[in-house]
């Protein structure tokens, strides 16, 4: 792996002014809250936040009620470190198992500068169910989004997602089923091959692109030419971001387009269970020795 594994926190219980109000996927909760209060919805036709803030900043940021979100995740075996990633953390207060978190000391994410990454204090975590509580004074300005846990661990999806020890190896096949359902970085496979130089062609995979040494393959035929082997050939599949940033509940999982509406589907086009696409290299590459 070229980055840490990820667990997406996108389903929560929510409380308005201390009263339990429901449970569900975070973007659907955002819509439910806004509809119940007669507030404008976020979406493809919304007035952009910067415009609202510039021309109606007082009402845009006016607190309307206290909102609390409770996210649950399970730790089967304690890893050496877990970090929490949040977008616009300055708008929220965070508590892990009742212990406050200080995002003022968080680092900027290397994925997107809108994210801040905070290493959690491991003494605040327990093996078993852990609860992340997120509080805010809700206003039109507030954006409810997913939060992300990252670290050197495996992930198992379910009604409550769980963390378990990082798998020692990754085999050919769908990495979603191997403990990496939300992972979207690079995975390097070590391909056994006698010393020499090879053309390497991959015919069965799903990733953004492939690379080895300083060469990349982005279009068919997915062939990397004149790659050296010292006994193994490093072959990296750089995965897409779909299983990290969604849509994560839309049916079908693999869609040729992605618009704001795809994140808030309902009825037959929505499943509370995660709808993830298969990713990784599914079968050994074809090697042609030069």
Model-found features: residue ranges?
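Short beta-strands within extracellular/lumenal beta-sheet-rich domains
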Residues: 59-75, 115-118, 183-194, 220-225
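Solvent-exposed beta-strand/loop surfaces of large extracellular or lumenal domains
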Residues: 94-118, 206, 210-224
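Aromatic-lined ligand-binding clefts that engage carbohydrates, nucleic acids, or primary amines
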Residues: 73-98, 132, 191-216, 233-237
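An acidic-aromatic loop/edge-strand motif
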Residues: 1-61, 88, 106-113, 120-191, ...
């Amino acid at each position: 792996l070229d980055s840490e594994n990820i667990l997406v926190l996108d389903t929560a219980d929510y409380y308005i002014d201390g009263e339990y109000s429901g449970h569900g996927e975070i973007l659907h909760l955002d819509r439910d809250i806004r509809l119940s209060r007669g507030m404008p919805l976020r979406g493809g036709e919304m007035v952009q936040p910067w415009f609202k803030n510039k021309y109606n900043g007082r009402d845009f940021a006016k607190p309307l009620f206290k909102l609390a979100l409770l996210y649950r995740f399970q730790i089967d075996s304690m890893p050496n470190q877990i970090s929490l990633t949040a977008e616009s953390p300055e708008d929220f207060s965070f508590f892990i198992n009742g212990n406050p978190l200080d995002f003022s000391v968080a680092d900027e994410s290397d994925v997107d500068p809108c994210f801040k990454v905070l290493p959690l204090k491991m003494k605040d975590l327990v093996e078993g169910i852990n609860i992340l509580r997120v509080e805010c004074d809700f206003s039109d300005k507030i954006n409810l989004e997913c939060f992300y846990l990252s670290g050197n661990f495996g992930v198992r999806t379910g009604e409550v997602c769980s963390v378990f020890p990082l798998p020692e190896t990754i085999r050919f096949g769908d990495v979603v089923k191997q403990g990496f359902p939300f992972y979207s970085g690079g995975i390097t496979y070590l391909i056994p091959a006698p010393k020499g130089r090879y053309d390497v062609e991959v015919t069965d995979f799903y990733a953004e692109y492939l690379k080895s040494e300083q060469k990349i393959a982005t279009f068919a035929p997915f062939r990397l030419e004149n790659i050296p082997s010292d006994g193994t050939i490093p072959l990296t599949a750089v995965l897409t971001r779909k299983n990290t940033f969604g849509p994560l509940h839309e049916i079908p999982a693999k869609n040729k387009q992605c618009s704001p509406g795809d994140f808030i589907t309902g009825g037959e086009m929505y499943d509370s269970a995660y709808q993830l696409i298969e990713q990784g290299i599914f079968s050994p590459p074809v090697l042609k020795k030069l």
